[in-house]
C-alpha cells in the first residue's frame, strides 16, 4: 500500500520548487533592471565628465583672453595723460557694447 505521507511530501516539494523558480525569476528580473540602471548611470556620468572637460578648456581660453585684455588696458592706463581721452572713449564704448549685446540677447529670447 502506498504511504499517503509520501504523496503529500511530493506535492509540497513541487509547490516549494515552483515557488523557488518564481522567486528566482523575480530576482533575476530585478537584477537585470539594476544592471540596466547602473549602466545608464555610468553612461550619464561619462557624458557629464566629457561636458565638464570641455567647459574647463573653454574657461581656460576665456581666462587667457581676459588676461590679455586686462594687460593691454593696464598698459594704456599707465602710459600717461595723452591716452586719457582714448581711455574714456574705449571705456564708454565697452559699456555701450555691453548694453547693446544685453538688449539683443534679451530681445532674441523673447
Curated annotation (Swiss-Prot):
Annotated TM spans: 86-106
GO MF annotation terms: SNAP receptor activity
Q: Which GO terms describe its biological process?
A: protein transport; regulation of retrograde vesicle-mediated transport, Golgi to ER; retrograde transport, endosome to Golgi
Q: Which organism is it from?
A: Danio rerio
Location in the cell reads: Golgi apparatus membrane
What InterPro entries does this protein map onto? Answer: BET1_SNARE, T_SNARE_dom
Q: How does it sit in the membrane?
A: Single-pass type IV membrane protein
Subunit-structure text: Component of a SNARE complex consisting of stx5, ykt6, gosr2 and bet1l.
Domain t-SNARE coiled-coil homology residue range list: 14-76
Q: Name one GO cellular component term.
A: cytosol
Q: Which residues lie on this side of the membrane: Cytoplasmic?
A: 1-85
Which ranges make up the Lumenal topological domains here?
107-110
Gene name, Swiss-Prot/TrEMBL: bet1l
Briefly, what is this protein's role? Vesicle SNARE required for targeting and fusion of retrograde transport vesicles with the Golgi complex. Required for the integrity of the Golgi complex.
Record key words, sorted:
Coiled coil, Golgi apparatus, Membrane, Protein transport, Transmembrane, Transmembrane helix, Transport
What name has this protein been given in UniProt?
A: BET1-like protein
Amino acid at each position: 500500500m502506498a504511504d499517503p505521507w509520501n504523496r503529500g511530501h511530493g506535492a509540497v516539494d513541487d509547490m516549494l520548487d515552483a515557488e523557488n523558480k518564481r522567486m528566482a525569476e523575480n530576482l533575476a528580473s530585478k537584477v537585470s533592471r539594476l544592471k540596466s540602471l547602473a549602466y545608464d548611470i555610468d553612461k550619464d556620468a561619462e557624458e557629464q565628465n566629457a561636458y565638464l572637460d570641455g567647459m574647463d578648456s573653454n574657461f581656460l581660453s576665456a581666462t587667457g583672453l581676459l588676461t590679455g585684455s586686462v594687460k593691454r588696458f593696464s598698459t594704456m592706463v599707465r602710459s600717461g595723460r595723452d591716452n586719457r581721452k582714448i581711455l574714456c572713449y574705449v571705456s564708454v564704448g565697452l559699456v555701450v557694447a555691453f548694453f547693446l549685446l544685453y538688449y539683443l540677447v534679451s530681445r532674441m529670447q523673447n
